[in-house]
């Protein structure tokens, strides 16, 4: 069995098919890991979900911010934005099956055999892997609970609280956990988030840095695969970290990583690009 990890899809199905063809992916024996943001802004969000759902036994995916946004819109906790390409999913006859599968995906996946973690945006520097797994489980429980789901989706939007505190409770606690796993790029050493800056490493506000750059980061030594940050262009010099968002939805490329060998392949995404970069959430 070979495990392949692929960066943010965002509804770009053809580049994914291109990559899977190139490695002769066999869902009967291989596994496909996805860093989240399966849908939105690309041309084939519905087809992408259907493709993944059809081979769901071979797919391991974490949730990204765009996936959560889709769930929020579907449950009428949020409205569609002009840049969203989600309407086809919302009007599809199989929407309930697709959305139910989506809501049951984790925020964080840890492979015991390979000792590799899969997450959309990252893990804040002040959390160990053990604590990160526990915090992710809190949000996952809310997503999978029929009664708690609408309340979570309605309250998950927002940039505050900007920093974790173990005394937080209720929706504020779940919101900051969600922001760490699905929206984080820059933060302070103690985990205070800046969610406005979305470009490259040299655009960090004073006192902030990429989440993975701190010497005190408690997940140093862990292998972590992540996406979300297209401006990195797949480059991350930190040992054990693999950045896979290479900007497919902006017309750049989609990247596949052989998790066991470390080999990377990319497929050109010209013609897939969204019309304009977003100015606000769910970035």
Curated annotation (Swiss-Prot):
EC supergroup of this enzyme:
hydrolase
* Enzyme Commission (EC) number: 3.6.1.41
Superkingdom, taxonomy of origin = Bacteria
What InterPro entries has UniProt attached to this entry? ApaH, Calcineurin-like_PHP_ApaH, Metallo-depent_PP-like
* Substrates-to-products reaction catalysed: P(1),P(4)-bis(5'-adenosyl) tetraphosphate + H2O = 2 ADP + 2 H(+)
Single Gene Ontology MF annotation = bis(5'-nucleosyl)-tetraphosphatase (symmetrical) activity
The reply to whether Thylakoid figures as a keyword in the UniProt entry is: no
Q: Which UniProt keywords apply?
A: Hydrolase
What family, per the record?
Answer: Belongs to the Ap4A hydrolase family.
Described function: Hydrolyzes diadenosine 5',5'''-P1,P4-tetraphosphate to yield ADP.
What protein name is recorded for this chain? Answer: Bis(5'-nucleosyl)-tetraphosphatase, symmetrical
